[in-house]
Amino acid sequence: CGAGAEWLRDKCALCLNCLRVCPYDVPVITEAGRIDIRVDQCQGCGICFPACPCKAIGFGMLGVTEIQSRLKDAIDEAKGRNGGPTIAVIYCDFDAYDITNLRRMMKGKHPGKLLVGIPCLAKLSAIDLLRAFEYGVDGVLAIGCPNNECTYQEGEYWGQRRVDEAKRLLAELEMADRLEMHYISGLDLDQFD
């Protein structure tokens, strides 16, 4: 489908992070001592993507630039919408939520909340979460799939881990309370209020 990971040989430092984090055992070490990402077996979860310090993994579905662009565009659109705080609501848009219901529920009620859909929160890095603050939001709410509802193995684990990493960094600035992670099933959107 072209949505999975692609190894960018010229950027790879052979750190083996992709091997460590992939729940599907897609990356392997070849006899020549190189990494091989078996594209035909990749599930497209994106867990390896933010784990690569050299950006040596290309991603067909949604890459770093696209994630940051979605975030920046949504924040720019929301600026000036109201005088109150702006909260970026980053949610899994892969299949956990009915976006129509989420938008309808928020319409008029929460003018300072902006929706940014990402196909699985595991694709986010701590830097992506921190960049939202750099772009001017007052807070970030990450909404992920509840345990065992994620389309991908370990998706909720890696999403939570990256939120925790960003919160640790924000704590040094006394801003940890501005980033929250919640798990809400598509059936439980009334919890969002």
Predicted features and spans:
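Gly-rich Lys/Arg/Thr-decorated short loops/hinges at beta-loop-alpha junctions or inter-strand turns
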Residues: 1-3, 29, 107-113
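Catalytic cores of glycan-processing enzymes that make or break glycosidic bonds
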Residues: 7
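Iron-sulfur-associated redox domains of electron-transfer enzymes in respiratory
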Residues: 49, 60-193
